[in-house]
């Protein structure tokens, strides 16, 4: 399947040229083939700088923007920048000119702009950021990791349904199990919202719902899908990334290669904005080199798999 991937070169922690170089690396990769292409979005200045020095035989298309969304912009400020690189990229996605859109920029702005431009699944109340993390048994899917700070139990149920549909559509497990991220495994633990969510998940998914799960148990692989509100999920994810980086730093060459692979969360795509009718991927603002390479490559795979359409089909 031929796919067209859009990527915002602006707004991340690194220079747009760093992202461009990784994009070219993906094109040059022996693991890649000709069944995909890129459309990049950048400021006029960056466009001119890249095109004047691009030596790639078929330089990817670059769409020039009048502005870009910064990390300091509020969602409202981002909406007002109607010709930003992020807004143009999402417009292209909305108009089916591209099959997926990737950004390393402002998360809140990306979520807000995506929701204003891209239709949400009819059965979804709120989109969620979905990410895969390594476990002792492969990987787990966790959502939400930052799209929604405050949610109610019905919205958490929606996250569980989307996580289940995602796991099933990528074919990793026929009957995935679900856990609710909480401060303890007992049913009575957590806020009233967590206790209500526990009851709703148990009634809805029955034996597939294994109850509450503590942060440390996620990595055992005891559940396949971890449901969380965006505030808790984001803290969990950033703590996990920090611990993985810490272990690799202090142990260095003492780690066996297979252990390093198990600790390497960068092998997975960035966070998918799950619940949208089209594919939007948020890569870490600090992503560069291998982590961004894997994020882009993984996004290509998700676009080829038509993951959004398959999730919608599963939810219908």
Swiss-Prot record:
Q: Is Lipid biosynthesis included in the keywords of this UniProt record?
A: yes
Where does the record say this protein resides?
Answer: Cytoplasm
Question: Which terms does the UniProt entry file under GO BP?
Answer: fatty acid biosynthetic process; phospholipid biosynthetic process
**Pfam families linked:** FA_synthesis
| Protein keywords | Cytoplasm, Lipid biosynthesis, Lipid metabolism, Phospholipid biosynthesis, Phospholipid metabolism, Transferase
Which pathway does the database say it acts in? Answer: Lipid metabolism; phospholipid metabolism
**Gene Ontology molecular function, alphabetical:** phosphate:acyl-[acyl carrier protein] acyltransferase activity
Supply the enzyme class, top level.
transferase
- Which residues are listed as membrane-spanning? none
UniProt subunit comment: Homodimer. Probably interacts with PlsY.
Indicate what this protein is called per its UniProt record. Phosphate acyltransferase
What organism is recorded for this protein?
A: Chlamydia felis (strain Fe/C-56) (Chlamydophila felis)
